[in-house]
């Protein structure tokens, strides 16, 4: 797998944010069609998916899968597996900071974990306390704060984190 710079990763996530991507569970960068919306079976998609017709859509890990494809790499579509098998280094967060005292590097994946669902959500830390995430069907791709419930971090395999870290 080619090394992808963290700045390239961040730039692709910023593109999804700027273009107003939507969230559809299971998606990874395709344009959501009316036919897909009409056939939707998930309640959240039936309720909120109409506003994403004609937009690119992804779920949280699907956004990573799409970005890696654009940059010539590969990232598994599934946040649990991303954390467990595709992190070259990982650990816990407390109030948005690494518990080992090291700085969180821009381009690092951040996760939400609970005992019943495991690592059930993933976003990308972009620096200065901000995360870009595909948040949910009602929200689409948005920014959030690193201190807003993110519990773990993982530096992804195939990403060059040599650029300056942010405290």
Label for each model-derived stretch:
Residues 1-74, 105, 118-121, 132-134, ...:
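N-terminal capping segments
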Residues 66, 70-90, 124-127:
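Short, basic/aromatic beta-hairpin or loop at an interaction surface
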Residues 76-78, 122-147:
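Catalytic Cys-His active-site segments of thiol-dependent hydrolases/isopeptidases
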Residues 88-98:
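Charged, often glycine-rich, active-site loop that binds/positions anionic groups
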Residues 98, 103-104:
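Short, well-ordered loop/turn sites that connect or cap secondary structure elements
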Residues 107-114:
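Short beta-strand segments that buttress and anchor functional surface loops
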Residues 114, 135, 157:
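Residues at the C-termini of beta-strands that transition into short coil/loop
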Residues 148-167:
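Low-complexity, Gly/Ser/Thr/Pro-rich intrinsically disordered linker/tail segments
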């Amino acid at each position: 797998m080619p090394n992808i710079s963290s700045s390239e990763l961040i730039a692709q996530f910023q593109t999804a944010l700027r273009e107003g991507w939507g969230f559809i569970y299971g998606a990874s960068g395709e344009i959501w069609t009316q036919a897909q919306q009409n056939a939707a079976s998930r309640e959240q998609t039936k309720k909120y998916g109409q506003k994403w017709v004609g937009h690119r859509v992804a779920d949280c890990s699907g956004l990573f899968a799409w970005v890696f494809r654009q940059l010539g790499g590969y990232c598994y579509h599934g946040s649990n597996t991303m954390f467990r098998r595709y992190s070259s280094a990982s650990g816990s967060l407390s109030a948005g900071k690494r518990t080992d005292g090291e700085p969180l590097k821009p381009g690092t994946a951040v996760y939400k974990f609970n005992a019943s669902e495991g690592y059930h959500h993933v976003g990308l830390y972009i620096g200065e306390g901000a995360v870009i995430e595909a948040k949910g069907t009602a929200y689409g791709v948005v920014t959030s704060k690193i201190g807003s419930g993110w519990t773990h971090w993982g530096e992804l395999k195939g990403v060059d984190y040599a650029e300056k870290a942010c405290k």
